[in-house]
Amino acid sequence: MALEATAKSVNFPKRAYVTFLAGAGDYVKGVVGLAKGLRKAKSAYPLVVAMLPDVPEEHRCILESQGCILREIEPLSPPENHTAKFAMAYYVINYSKLRIWEFEEYDKLIYLDGDIQVFGNIDHLFDLPDGYFYAVMDCFCENCPERVQWPAELGSPPPLYFNAGMFVYEPKLSTYHDILETVKVTPPTLFAEQVILI
């Protein structure tokens, strides 16, 4: 029986959802909501939580009780040339999110920010053709100026690009190293790692 299970796991590509978590704050509640949403939508795939060492044991226990796979990652600091002020100070920890490209035990992953709510099954996104990076276009304030204005203190709005809160990708160490090299030569932006990925 064990051999049969092993053979089956070899025949089927390994897929999972992945999210990022750092610190002892309330963000864990969003990740719990994400895990519950994926279960309610009857997703066939697990949720991997890429987390920094500062996530407390209490939060880890909560996530494990929700069926999450916990994967501790080391913090990744921005390079010295990225000392600019970010739109939000906590964006600096988001460079660590780039480590999810190291998760080569999976063939394909769907990254979801921990504060995303899943209302329907999105497993079909795993079936998109391999070899591509899939993401959704970011929605900037100028798309709905009657509701939200781009803050003048942030300067000109950035060019159109995707939102790094949801994307489909294939983890590879070579891609991870290419991203790190790109970070070194890319001027810093207000949105930390998000612009690096475009």
Regions found by a protein language model. Name each.
Residues 1-198:
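Glycosyltransferase catalytic domains, chiefly GT-A lineage
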